[in-house]
């Protein structure tokens, strides 16, 4: 009889091994066997929990996305009700420590690439994109006309993705302070009174 709670412990162990495998070997070098080896268990157990490599990547991305959504919720809850503060909180969540480690950044890049080919991953990407846009648009709409709020949300989302992508590809630790300053300056420009 399996131990109570062992399923979640095992899944977390395998997701961590997947993150490490993608970090060290990339997505092409990540196999059920390489994940099993890193987790020190049999390939059959990996297959039992996730089915195949796509299932493993999906579960890993769901984990990373839950961390992102938790960071967003936590940072928004700590911010004042002012739209500027709440927008900055959403931006900061995207550069949270849970999102900028080398294993997570490489997994994001692999996920984005695979989401163009795998319907389940594409759906996860769309949910994430819509959630970000919705969060940004809701805050911008508190001070900007609706059409302008949508444009501002699209622009800030693109800036977040661009800063994050450049940071991920830089080959060195992401300069979160510089990224946050650029994004926050952009927010300030968008919310500045128009003459």
UniProtKB/Swiss-Prot annotation:
This protein's UniProt keywords? DNA-binding, Repressor, Transcription, Transcription regulation
- Domain HTH tetR-type intervals: 8-68
Q: Which residues bind DNA?
A: 31-50
Query: What is the superkingdom listed in this entry's lineage?
Result: Bacteria
PROSITE patterns recorded for this chain? HTH_TETR_1 (PS01081), HTH_TETR_2 (PS50977)
Pathway of action: Amine and polyamine biosynthesis; betaine biosynthesis via choline pathway [regulation]
Q: Which GO terms describe its biological process?
A: glycine betaine biosynthetic process from choline; negative regulation of DNA-templated transcription
NCBIfam families hit by this protein:
betaine_BetI (TIGR03384), PRK00767.1 (NF001978)
Q: What does this protein do?
A: Repressor involved in the biosynthesis of the osmoprotectant glycine betaine. It represses transcription of the choline transporter BetT and the genes of BetAB involved in the synthesis of glycine betaine.
Q: What is this protein called?
A: HTH-type transcriptional regulator BetI
């Amino acid at each position: 009889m399996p131990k109570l709670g062992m399923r979640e412990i095992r899944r977390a162990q395998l997701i961590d091994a997947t993150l490490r495998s993608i970090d060290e070997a990339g997505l092409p070098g990540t196999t059920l066997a390489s994940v099993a080896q890193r987790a020190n268990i049999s390939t059959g157990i990996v297959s039992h929990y996730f089915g195949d490599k796509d299932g493993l990547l999906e579960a890993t991305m769901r984990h990373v996305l839950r961390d992102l959504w938790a960071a967003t919720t936590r940072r928004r809850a700590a911010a004042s009700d002012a739209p500027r503060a709440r927008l900055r909180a959403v931006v900061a969540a995207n550069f949270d420590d849970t999102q900028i480690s080398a294993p997570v950044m490489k997994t994001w890049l692999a996920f984005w690439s695979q989401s163009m080919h795998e319907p389940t991953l594409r759906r996860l990407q769309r949910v994430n994109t819509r959630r970000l846009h919705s969060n940004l648009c809701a805050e911008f709409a508190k001070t900007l006309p609706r059409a302008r709020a949508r444009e501002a949300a699209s622009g800030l989302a693109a800036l977040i993705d661009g800063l994050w992508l450049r940071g991920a590809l830089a080959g060195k630790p992401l300069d979160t302070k510089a990224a946050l300053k650029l994004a926050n300056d952009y927010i300030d420009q968008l919310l500045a009174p128009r003459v």
